[in-house]
């Protein structure tokens, strides 16, 4: 089933915090994107107001159900902004994570990264996620008792890979997140992100728009089917998943 999760907490070391409005979208077929813009960016953050962003297809993650509400997910991100921008002390390669369902409906994610090299000391992290109902305009939490939306929420994924660009758009219910990156750029000038919300009126509202080429990211998702092509300002996107 598709999922939309809002992060409630991020912790490295003894002090938890949350400075972002992070949403992670996971499609029915397992494609994913996580956009993590700062709520109150300051200083150098103003030019690139993101803690992090990453995305990938289901070919870039290995998911294993361990039972008793525990799942492991091992990621090899297609897009990792830290890697794309060559940020110093950035983990490279697979990221191993463990996800545990809480009775409340929240999901705890734990794992470790190796920013100084695979043979160096690891850095452990912890994140807490709240599933929300993607079929609602407001951020309505999902508890173990109100998950009926899941069978009705649409799940649409568009992808672009050509000589100049990589890109992925994931539509989960009313909520849309996407990225477009220029190949061989590796600066913030090559990154573009959108987060859209389809309102009750039928119109879409930009909650996030970053980059000089966001107009190349599709912003309408009607009359599609798997395998079809959408052209947005000269860039062709393939529909790789369609459940509506």
From Swiss-Prot:
- Coiled-coil annotated residue ranges, if any: none
* Keyword Phosphoprotein in annotation: yes
List the subcellular locations: Cytoplasm; Nucleus
Determine if Ion transport is one of this entry's keywords.
Answer: no
Positions where Phosphoserine occurs in the chain:
143
Q: Which keywords does UniProt give here?
A: Cytoplasm, Nucleus, Phosphoprotein
GO CC terms in record: cytoplasm; nucleus
Alphabetized InterPro entries for the sequence: Hri1, Hri1_N, Hri1_N_sf
Q: Which family does it belong to?
A: Belongs to the HRI1 family.
Quaternary context:
Interacts with HRR25. May interact with SEC72.
* The protein, known as: Protein HRI1
Organism expressing this protein natively: Saccharomyces cerevisiae (strain YJM789) (Baker's yeast)
